[in-house]
Amino acid sequence: MNHLRAEGPASVLAIGTANPENILIQDEFPDYYFRVTKSEHMTQLKEKFRKICDKSMIRKRNCFLNEEHLKQNPRLVEHEMQTLDARQDMLVVEVPKLGKDACAKAIKEWGQPKSKITHLIFTSASTTDMPGADYHCAKLLGLSPSVKRVMMYQLGCYGGGTVLRIAKDIAENNKGARVLAVCCDIMACLFRGPSDSDLELLVGQAIFGDGAAAVIVGAEPDESVGERPIFELVSTGQTILPNSEGTIGGHIREAGLIFDLHKDVPMLISNNIEKCLIEAFTPIGISDWNSIFWITHPGGKAILDKVEEKLHLKKEKFVDSRHVLSEHGNMSSSTVLFVMDELRKRSLEEGKSTTGDGFEWGVLFGFGPGLTVETVVLRSVPINY
């Protein structure tokens, strides 16, 4: 049966990203948010929110939900109004559309006919429907009716690592497979007006943005038709951090997606991340965490700061994660793939010798509900100028 399996590791062959056109400037967002939610009388809460936004290190975000949508659906701005139907009516349409835009860019970079795509993986925490966003995305792209689909709902911020793990397994166990993996989240699911008793909501309103990212994964790249690897997917792992239950969560309720984020999350991640690194890199013989490149989900400034401090990392290790956080906010599952895209582009622009900032080996980390950590060991490829 080995002849049915690919030889060699799977690689990322192309990356595409997409965002809604509507842009939110972070400095202006507190005034906007309290105005459109008719909450300007809550002056003390607004000042708290302004401080949260100021500390976020986010410059701007993209957001599908604009003021026109809120005028058409005025109940969305109420804190506890039953608005799940209205939110889902929008998201079941918009999530596959934004995902399709990212997929189209990845397919264009890949340069091969879309008929060669054998598998489609889609993840989103924004919506749930049957048939799912995978089905609608496949139809929008005009993929073969026989493309093998996997739909994963409600993974949250670790989903970017999950799709790479599953895409790797599929590509390596099905010779000739080309896997299109896409993450898309639109935060209209959690936009609500403020409440004095719900400060976690304010954190979510301050950091989350909308985005989609897609990768094409395959083993044995066919260079005769122009396929080129960007990163090899060497190994993958997933773990639940100890004593972390209830620290990150999301709950679908009549008012939409209710977001939980405990203040101990940065500490929990920073205290446990080295164990993940040791398990992943001991087989390779690497123990210097500054000797690898980093593709880290920027869940927030505090997480990056704590990990950087705990592992004594050089400032440049998180430059791509911080850039994506600044320009887009936390886009949930797609964010870490935006960081991957930023790293390979910056490596080329700065004349680095590899797609991994000049380093051979690297790690991709996704963090999310559970508290779940996805770890992917990557190998960069040389850049030929």
Swiss-Prot record:
Enzyme class: transferase
Native source organism of the sequence: Cannabis sativa (Hemp)
Name of the protein this chain belongs to: Polyketide synthase 5
One Pfam family linked to the record: Chal_sti_synt_C
PANTHER family: CHALCONE SYNTHASE (PTHR11877:SF14), HYDROXYMETHYLGLUTARYL-COA SYNTHASE (PTHR11877)
Family: Belongs to the thiolase-like superfamily. Chalcone/stilbene synthases family.
UniProt note on tissues of expression: Expressed in glandular trichomes.
Function recorded in the entry: Polyketide synthase responsible for the biosynthesis of secondary metabolites.
Active site: C157
One GO cellular component, as annotated: cytoplasm
GO biological process, one term: polyketide biosynthetic process
UniProt keywords, alphabetically: Acyltransferase, Cytoplasm, Transferase
Assigned EC number: 2.3.1.-
